[in-house]
Amino acid sequence: MTKTNDLAEALIVERTFNAPVERVWTALTDVNEMRQWYFDLKEFKAESGFEFEFVVEHDGNTYHHLCRVTEVIPEKKIAYTWRYKGEPGDSLVTFELFPEGDRTRLKLTHTGIETFPKTPAYARKNFEAGWTAIVGSELKQFLEGSKAKP
């Protein structure tokens, strides 16, 4: 029996929000909304081939993210490549939306994490913690909290 390398397995984070799919889609694809819960993006368009970037400072290090939208199915799915300037590795982040009445289940899948440098900064547990906070806390608060739009 072969043991699968945990690092090579897709990272999946799922959450259900008290918001309709149209509202969640807008939060995932409108740059002005994304800046409020995601990252400080200069530009973003939900169009296949659109390239965007952003910089994150964490623990005294700077991480320059380079991304390219690869797939868009309005109100259902958006995917983009995710890599770091000057570092080896390529990954793919996919957001999928599933309507559940007036609620929406979001499934985030991040594949290719194992292609990044084998250093603590790029450890799978850091990606798990980051996506859990972004989707489970920041996006949830944005969609359901006191600043949420109807």
Can you say where each PLM-predicted feature lies in the sequence?
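Hydrophobic ligand-binding cavity/cleft-lining segments
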Residues: 1-43
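A conserved amphipathic terminal alpha-helix motif
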Residues: 6, 112-150
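Residue-level signal for tight coil/turn positions that link beta-strands
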Residues: 8, 21, 49, 73-76, ...
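Residue-level preference for beta-strand/loop junctions
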Residues: 8-9, 48, 61, 89
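Hydrophobic pocket/interface hotspot
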Residues: 24, 34, 52-54, 69, ...
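A solvent-exposed, acidic/Ser-Thr-rich amphipathic alpha-helical stretch
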Residues: 40-54
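Hydrophobic-ligand binding "helix-grip"
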Residues: 43, 58-105, 111-114
